Amino acid sequence: MNTHNNNYQQRSMDSAIVTINDKGYIQSVDRKTCELFGYTIEELQLQKVNILVPSPYKEQHDTYMQSYFETGVRKIIDKSRVVEGLHKDGSVFPITLSVTEVRIWNKRMFIGSIESIIDKRLIIYTDVHGIITYCNRNVEELIGYTPAELFGKNVSALMPSPHAKSHSEYIEKNYHGGGLWKMLNRVRNLPIKHKSGVVFLVSILVTKISTDGIDMFKAIIQTPPKEAVFTINGDGIIKACNFNFTEPMFGYTQKDLLGNTIGLLIPEMSKIIDNTSLNLTDSHDPQLQQQQQTTTTTTTTTTTTSTTSTTTSTPTPASIAVSGNNISSPPIDSPLTTPSTPTTFNHSRGVESWLGRTRKVDVWHRDGSRFPVNLEIIKLQGENSMFSLQIKKVENPRVYGKDKDKNGGGGGTTENKDGKQLDTIKESKEHRHSKEKKKRKKDRDHNNNNNNNNNNNNNNNEQTSDSSDSSDSDSESRSKKKRSSKKKSRRDDSSSDSSDSETESSSSPHKKNRSSNSSSNSSHSNAPHESSYYQPEMIGEYTLGKTLGRGNYGVVKLGTHINTKEEIAIKILYKEQMTESEFTRCKREIEILKQLYHPFINKLLNVLEKDDAMFILMDYCQGGDLFHYVNKFGLKGVKMVNSPDIGDQVLMGVPLPEDDTKRIFTQICLGIAHCHKLNIAHRDIKHKNILFDNQMNVKIIDFGLSNWSYQEKMSFCGTPAYAAPEMLLGINYNGPEVDIWSLGVILYSLVTGKLPFINVTDMIVGKFILPPSIPLDLQDLIKKMLTVDREHRLNIMNVLNHPWLSKDPASSTLISQNLLHSPPVVHQPQPPQHQKIQPTSIIPNFNEVETLKNNILNNNNNNNNNNNNNNNNILNSNNNNNNNNNNNSNNNNIINNSNNNSNNNNNINNNINNNNNVNNNVNNNKNNNNNNNNNSNNNSNNGNNIPNSSNNTNSIINNNLYNQSLSPQNNNIYQHSPQHQQHQHQQQHSPQQQQHQQHQHHQQQQQQLQQQHHQQHHQQHQQHQQQHQQQHQQQHQQHQQHQQSHQQPPVYFPTQIISDDFNLTSQLQRTQPNQQVSFDTNQSYQQQLQQPQIPHQVLMQQPPQILSHSNNQPINNYYVGQQPIQQIQQLQQQQQLQQQQQQQQQQQQQQQQQQQQQQQQQQQQQQQQQQQQQQQQQQQQQQQQQQNDPNFQPHLRRIKMSKRDNSYNKRKSEDGDSYKKRDNQSYDDILKDEGNKRLRELQTYSEGDKSRQHYNRDSNDNSRDNNRYNNRDNNNNNNSNNNRERDRYKKNKNENFDYGKYKFGKSNEDEENKDKPNIVREKPDFKPSGSLKNDSSSNYGTISSGRNNNNGEEDEENKIKLKWHEPAEAKLPTEKWMLYPFKGKDQLDTIYLHRKKSFLFGRNRDIADIPIDHPSCSSQHAVIVFRIRKKENPNTGSIKTFILPYIIDLESTNGTFLKGEKIEPAKYFELRPKDKITFGTSTREYILLCEDSIEGDESEEEDSD
């Protein structure tokens, strides 16, 4: 029983989830539900849940729910049952359904857990002698054998006695002797024997198949279902039944039962059905036809002889037949044979008389056997009186027989010495039934010569009908013999069969002879198997061993290396059992495992793929999984979520010690932290997915449901028992927070031995109980991890930094070692950022801020060296938080403004190390205050080294950031947040920790003093502000005069100080070159520190302010010298007016430009219209000429001639127009044009003056011969070149040319077409193969044409299309084929590709390393590209250009061989004519032929062979 619960527990945790409201409408579904039923999420939302189930479950569900709302009786709530699901395509399949009620936001909702039942049917093929030739993989789970063990055995080895003894004789008598095939095409219930010796009942269907004249038998074996559902009307007529369960349970198909009465299966119900509505017909079953006739004649005679008997007795079920499909009911004698016969009933009520309670009745199988069931009838909703019948098999039939005998007054059970019940002798009613059954069998049998044979047949029929009782008795007798003998090893099948045959021989001597013959035959058939040797299955260099685990579409087996004996785990995924989405998930798991390399994540070794399966090779974890680790002593009383009797917490195992829990949980968190660092969320963390190696270290597996996180998703993944509330409710989530919830569930189970939640309602609301024995730190961690609000849920770094782990020395050491020495992370390349980087800087305290201002504005000769070396480092800052490279490069910065927390330690240390330089600069400034001219010179020199500020700074200043007050949440302006300090403390090495703490403590003290000083200064400043307002105006006038006399270089100055949780940033603005800055030399050094110099022409409404962290009051107002604010505002207004004037001028200029552009466009349009009119007139004239010319052929356009031809320019324009039209032409039209062009070439060459014409074979091809001939033309060798061209095309004048399915040129066999013009005609025998059968976009390749659109991107329309063809099989020796681009071939040689045997270089693939301006032809393992090579002639100095083919191996598994030698991957290898190429282990060879080597094809082919 525990095993059963355990299996159910694992199944229930891998189910799909559907959320339903109280009205039966679907609110949300998960991804697995969509895959299971074939719908999308949008199609299922707001639909009735009945869309997922067929009849009769569709009507039954509404009735159950309505009854629950009215009465509160939970028929299906909190219970699991096996029903049928309805796919979108109409197919029906079995599922397991569990419904749980939840309340969310005071609303009633229901959570449906749906699980697909795996097909566990055993399929066996045997020959005519019963020898097993094939069996599927379910044989190991059903009967314990492997396919290799059963191959070659006789099928009788799987049968217990007496079936094993009589099977061989039955085959000889019926098949070879021409007997009656009564056992074929019928579903029967028979016992079968497990490898361990246990006998149990199965449902079997045997059919005969013939393949190529060879007869074979196919047997489908499965365990009978335990539940069936019917829908009947008031007359007992079956209107609907479940599709998958009726045939294996009752032997009838759904088609046989629809329209017939329920009395066919339950004879007792025929009493409550109106007999007048039934018609008597014959049975369609050949076995029961004679039985129908016999019983009907018997009943008719009894009814005619005695009127009293017919009126007082109840009609027998044998007399009740079925109308529709001619099926008769099973035989039964009297009402005494049924267990719960009602004493009185009302005919008027009919089926309604059985409503309200569950009854135990007998159900008849089609083969004549019967078995007890529990029957429950409910009335469905609706106007028509329809009823639902739910039939459940009785688990222990003998207990039911015991109750039946007590109630019926006959029969019983006895007990042996061990206290176990044994079957006694049948009572008188059972004997009467068996005798009458034998009598009917004798009347049906025509061969009554031998009474012994008849007795044997009757005994066999008895054993068939009572197969369940015989199977139980055989199993108990066998177990009794094993206990008496006390042998550890199980007995052989032959010895058990012989012992059974001896016990049976005492009762029947005829059976003894028959069994001896069958046993000898079976032993003879098993002899070859015992001496045979089965070679183990191989995967690469590994042999497959035992099965480590199973899944929905694959298994995990142990693999052992042949030489090293190293053990690995091989995950085998069968493609035939996987859907497209599951196969995509498998590929995603492989891609994610390639990115992960961590000591606590199972490592991917290799991936192998075949046509029918995929093999994933991984490390073998010998320590088992976490589920078995916590379940060392076995599960007792296991209860799972959605189970029928739920009420307690789910028991997972024994609680682990705290030290062991910390070690395991820390390793799991470190592995998940590595995944989150790569933006990968696991989404299926559970006990089964956490393994242990031989040293008991954690290894995380099963990334099939993982995905790249940090993007909102609604898909439901993982196991419901570990799923977060947002997954159950269908709320968008990122991914990492879901993993934290699952980790919280695992942590709870490790310390308590139980799962935290009792039902789905508690999962959604986050209700769980923490035992008081758990430490307080651990309770706090579990509460924060199992928080329903995902925004307040901890992340993985907070979990690792929690006190429960950080206080433990072993855990903290493991965390620090893993984080400091974590494996390198390969970041994905980010796109280049074209925007300028805004300068920023980190300001740790206010002293350094003021010192920095003074260093910038008051540089002198003494600190020129320091500032020249560090000026860029001081002012060059970066606001890009994600740019790690800039953060690493600024380690030497005195003040580094960056929001990257991981680099703050180095910044603080750098600040500490550079304090001396700052102090020196301050002293130098103090000593040289009087040297104002030198300061200004230094500033002008240093200004060149300061980079220009980015546009981002200007935009921020223009938005008047000084009006924005700092956030009230950022109370600590100059102090880092505690989280940030703790993060710094963890990342520093042990020597730096004490230094950092001292610096932090000193920094806090300084900040407190500075804040007090700033508050006092701010109050004093407000008092004196009004008094000095007039002085500011005067000083402002003086300042303007001083500005005109002295121009200062542009400088940086702080405009705003922003505080956040981690650092203090200072945004700097650079003044424009035309702006001036004045310096008040009369001010003291302290005044200059308190009042930094700011340019007057700054677009700000008020000076920058620093707000106090306590009352948000300004600490210090920054302004220039004694200048008042009003004057600054006047300057701002003046500048605004100037800007408005400039904008008006710019608008006027833009309007003028637009008017000019419009005029130009109008002129261009007029010119285009005129050109179009001229072209139309020319076309009309040409059409008139063509109509007058009878010999004109529009499809034969002459090609371009030499430049010496008088019509060269005219033909060039014609060619240009024709290429423009090609974009809109179809592929067939282009083929016709190319073929016609080749014909016109030959005609043009034969006509006219040969001495004046220089023929170019194709205007777009630039072959090696053309390159060679053009070079000879440059060397005054035009005559020889022309002679060669003439000779070649004289020879090929009458030759045919093939392009795909079109053929060009004249045919010598067609005499009728000799005088007709050469036109394009389609080849009749053209048969495209491979990918060319479907002319889709995948058959085309593209190369760049070098043309860009207005946006600077490559135009899709200008891309050059390539297509690959396969030659006709009849033209193999001399057929010439080439990779033919349609345009852009000016730099390409003509390369012909010749098919040597059966195919040409496979399919094309997109490869980034191939030059985009050259076409390529690729195979499964290698690619051929064309590269440009230049060579200088030492005699003439001219440079020749060659286009040569090269081959590149793509790092394939099997490699590529060139001329018999394997080439190195990722390198270019030059190809030459007649080179032979072999790809991988393929036996096909390929030859690359150029134009010079085509003519001698036939002789060269013989030499190559």
Swiss-Prot record:
It catalyses: L-seryl-[protein] + ATP = O-phospho-L-seryl-[protein] + ADP + H(+); L-threonyl-[protein] + ATP = O-phospho-L-threonyl-[protein] + ADP + H(+). ATP binds at L548, G549, R550, G551, N552, Y553, G554, V555, V556, K571. Residues 903-939, 1125-1189 form a coiled coil. One of its GO terms (biological process) is intracellular signal transduction. GO terms for molecular function: ATP binding; protein serine kinase activity; protein serine/threonine kinase activity. Keywords: ATP-binding, Coiled coil, Kinase, Nucleotide-binding, Repeat, Serine/threonine-protein kinase, Transferase. The keyword Cytoplasm does not apply. Residues 1399-1463 form the FHA domain. The keyword RNA-binding does not apply. Residues 398-407, 415-430, 1202-1271, 1283-1301, 1313-1326 have a biased composition (Basic and acidic residues). Residues 2-72, 108-178, 215-284 form the PAS domain. Pfam families: FHA, PAS, PAS_9, Pkinase. Its EC number is 2.7.11.1. Residues 542-805 form the Protein kinase domain. Residues 289-314, 328-344, 448-468, 515-532, 855-960, 975-1013, 1022-1048, 1272-1282 have a biased composition (Low complexity). Residues 431-443, 479-489 have a biased composition (Basic residues). Belongs to the protein kinase superfamily. CAMK Ser/Thr protein kinase family. SNF1 subfamily. This is Probable serine/threonine-protein kinase DDB_G0280133. It comes from Dictyostelium discoideum (Social amoeba).
